[in-house]
């Protein structure tokens, strides 16, 4: 049976007509009755402007074979998307021509009018509104109906149709590649009722995808693939690619893309989280780590952990020399420099070195005269914020640091630490010349000047010189009437308030400094230190003439007088 396409001038032949591909000789006759066959048995026919080739039917798959017999009860049409009863598909629409008697299935199950009928083609469903499978030129009997096409053919070994593809001949449909089945991006399978009944396409099997379904973006944007388009991983055209396999239950519809409101007009720079937890340079940026106690936020989680040690009192970093503990490793490194004597930060103007960079910055303000921190009460300015805080406590009389041993309070933490050495007897600062040790560094400096006979501090009133500035300040009060401290019990006057406090203990009997070994108490810390040497056997004061050592400086002075008397 022959039909003529309305617009293309191509002659469509039924697959099962005597002159079709099913002839025993494997030949195809043109309208003039001529037959052409190449060396390998492949048949080529030229009609109008179109060329197509039909492969030779393999042995055993002729239409006369029992597996391919349309009248056989086992035969079922193989197009799963060819459903005459689906909406929009009218089997009686104008232009519909029923298939030839040789092709029409005889069993009730294959009757197009039967409700149980389902087309078996696994890959073809026309989606274009203007192209129906039953429109002229779209019959299954067309020479271009080929289930064996790489993208749409049945994989069942019992059935292989030899036509090169199923191509609609309607004027609005234009095939992209006759050898690769339907290539137009408009002809995609969207039918949710798609159900494969072939034994090769049951649940869990694989079925091929068309090249357009491999590229969902071309579907969304309406881009039609070109015949000359090549894949990115090879130079062969799209039509020559092998079929893709995909699970049968997969959705073949193109995904929907949401258009951005402003996809290209971007401003600023987007930065991802880096080493510092996404915090931007300059201290600005997100601070996602929030302290659950005080609510302070931090850009890095490690900084939050360090901050929380303020609340918990945890000090995991311990000095191996003195066993002092710190909450941060940087504080431990700074502390260790007090034992090693390392001073890596040096002033470029005077050459003075410091163990901490903050001390160097503070020192450099002495050269520049810069004092940015001003007291709001008296207007006095300071070069460092810690000096200002210390000064402000003189106005508020605040003493937040108290000794746990004796309860004495101090306005500075450093003063409390120096005081606690009185109770522990610790004297970490020793003289390099005589070996004498001190609990405070400030006491070691004037002692070192005593060996050099250096007295850099001179009284402006009388010209007397002193080795310590504190001693000069005490002396200066003697020239200022009314700047003395008198005892309210006996009326005795003193130049220093600390001396008055020590004197008052003679009236009250208070002995706050107690020996940890024998329990003996003293009213002065210096007396307790001298007493500690009785238990330790320490003799830091050594005679330069005979080498004899003493535990107290007064004993050394008394001994040196014996040598002076002998020289006379």
Swiss-Prot record:
UniProt cross-references to SUPFAM superfamilies, sorted A to Z: beta-beta-alpha zinc fingers
Keyword Nucleus found: yes
Low complexity bias (residue ranges): 62-80
Post-translational modification summary for this protein: May be phosphorylated at residue 'Ser-5' of the tandem heptapeptide repeats in the N-terminus. Phosphorylation might be increased upon RAS pathway activation and negatively regulate protein stability.
Modified residues (Phosphothreonine): 35, 189, 312, 424
Molecular functions (GO terms): sequence-specific double-stranded DNA binding; zinc ion binding
Keywords: Chromosome, DNA-binding, Metal-binding, Nucleus, Phosphoprotein, Repeat, Transcription, Transcription regulation, Zinc, Zinc-finger
Record PTM Phosphoserine, positions in chain: 17, 23, 27, 36, 65, 72, 79, 86, 93, 100, 107, 114, 121, 128, 135, 149, 154, 191, 323, 327, 470
Basic and acidic residues bias spans: 1-16
UniProt region (Disordered), positions on chain: 1-223, 228-247, 264-287
Span of zinc fingers (C2H2-type): 289-311, 317-339, 345-367, 373-395, 401-423, 429-451, 457-479, 485-507, 513-535, 541-563
One Gene Ontology biological process: transcription by RNA polymerase II
Polar residues composition bias: residue spans: 110-122, 159-186
Organism domain of life: Eukaryota
One cellular component (GO) term of this entry: chromosome
Modified residues (Phosphotyrosine): 152, 317
Location in the cell: Nucleus; Chromosome
Function in brief: Binds to mammalian-wide interspersed repeat (MIRs) sequences in euchromatin and promoter regions of genes at the consensus sequence 5'-GCTGTGTG-[N20]-CCTCTCTG-3', consisting of two anchor regions connected by a linker region; the linker region probably does not contribute to the binding specificity. Required for cell homeostasis. May be involved in transcriptional regulation.
Subunit structure, as described in the record: Interacts (via zinc-finger domains) with TP53 (via N-terminus); interaction might be facilitated by TP53 oligomerization state. Interacts with ELP3.
Protein name per its UniProtKB record: Zinc finger protein 768
Species of origin: Mus musculus (Mouse)
């Amino acid at each position: 049976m022959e039909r003529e396409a309305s617009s293309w001038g191509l002659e469509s032949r039924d697959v099962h007509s005597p002159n079709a591909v099913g002839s025993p000789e494997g030949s195809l006759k043109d309208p003039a009755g001529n037959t052409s066959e190449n060396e390998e048995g492949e048949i080529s026919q030229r009609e109008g402007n179109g060329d197509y080739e039909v492969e030779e039917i393999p042995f055993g798959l002729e239409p006369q074979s029992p597996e391919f017999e349309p009248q056989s009860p086992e035969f079922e049409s193989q197009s799963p998307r060819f459903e005459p009863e689906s909406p929009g598909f009218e089997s009686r629409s104008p232009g519909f021509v029923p298939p030839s008697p040789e092709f029409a299935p005889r069993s009730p199950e294959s009757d197009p009018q039967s409700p149980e009928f389902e087309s078996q083609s696994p890959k073809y469903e026309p989606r274009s509104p203007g192209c129906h499978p039953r429109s002229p030129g779209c019959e299954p009997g067309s020479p271009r109906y080929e289930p064996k096409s790489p993208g749409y053919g049945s994989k069942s070994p019992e059935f292989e149709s030899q036509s090169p593809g199923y191509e609609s001949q309607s004027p609005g449909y234009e095939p992209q590649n006759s050898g690769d089945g339907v290539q137009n991006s408009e002809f995609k399978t969207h039918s949710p009722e798609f159900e494969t009944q072939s034994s090769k396409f049951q649940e869990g099997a694989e079925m091929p995808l068309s090249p357009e379904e491999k590229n969902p973006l071309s579907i969304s944007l309406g881009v039609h693939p070109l015949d000359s388009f090549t894949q990115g991983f090879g130079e062969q055209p799209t039509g020559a690619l092998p079929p893709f396999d995909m699970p049968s239950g997969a959705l073949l519809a193109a995904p929907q893309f949401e258009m951005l409101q402003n996809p290209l007009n971007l401003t600023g720079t987007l930065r991802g989280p880096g080493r510092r937890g996404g915090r931007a340079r300059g201290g600005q940026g997100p601070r996602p780590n929030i302290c659950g106690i005080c609510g302070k936020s931090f850009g890095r989680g490690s900084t939050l952990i360090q901050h929380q040690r303020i609340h918990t009192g945890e000090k995991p970093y311990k000095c191996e020399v003195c066993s002092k503990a710190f909450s941060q490793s940087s504080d431990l490194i700074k502390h260790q420099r007090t034992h090693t004597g390392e001073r890596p930060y040096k002033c470029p103007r005077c050459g003075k070195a410091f163990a901490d960079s903050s001390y160097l910055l503070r020192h450099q303000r002495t050269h520049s005269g810069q004092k940015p921190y001003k007291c709001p009460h008296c207007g006095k300015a300071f070069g460092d914020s810690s000096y200002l805080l210390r000064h402000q406590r003189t106005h508020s009389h605040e003493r937040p640091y108290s000794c746990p041993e004796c309860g004495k309070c101090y306005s500075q933490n450093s003063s409390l630490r120096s005081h606690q050495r009185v109770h522990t007897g610790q004297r970490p600062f020793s003289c390099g010349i005589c070996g004498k040790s001190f609990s405070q560094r400030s006491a070691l400096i004037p002692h070192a000047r005593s060996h050099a006979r250096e007295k850099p501090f001179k009284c402006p009133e009388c010209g007397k010189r002193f080795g310590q500035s504190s001693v000069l300040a005490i002396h200066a009060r003697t020239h200022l009437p009314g700047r003395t401290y008198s005892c309210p019990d006996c009326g005795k006057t003193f130049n220093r308030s600390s001396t008055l406090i020590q004197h008052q203990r003679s009236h009250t009997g208070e002995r706050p400094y107690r020996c940890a070994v024998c329990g003996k108490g003293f009213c002065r810390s210096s007396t307790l230190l001298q007493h500690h040497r009785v238990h330790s056997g320490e003799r830091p004061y050594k005679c330069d003439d005979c080498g004899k050592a003493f535990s107290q400086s007064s004993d050394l002075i008394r001994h040196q007088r014996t040598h002076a008397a002998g020289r006379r």
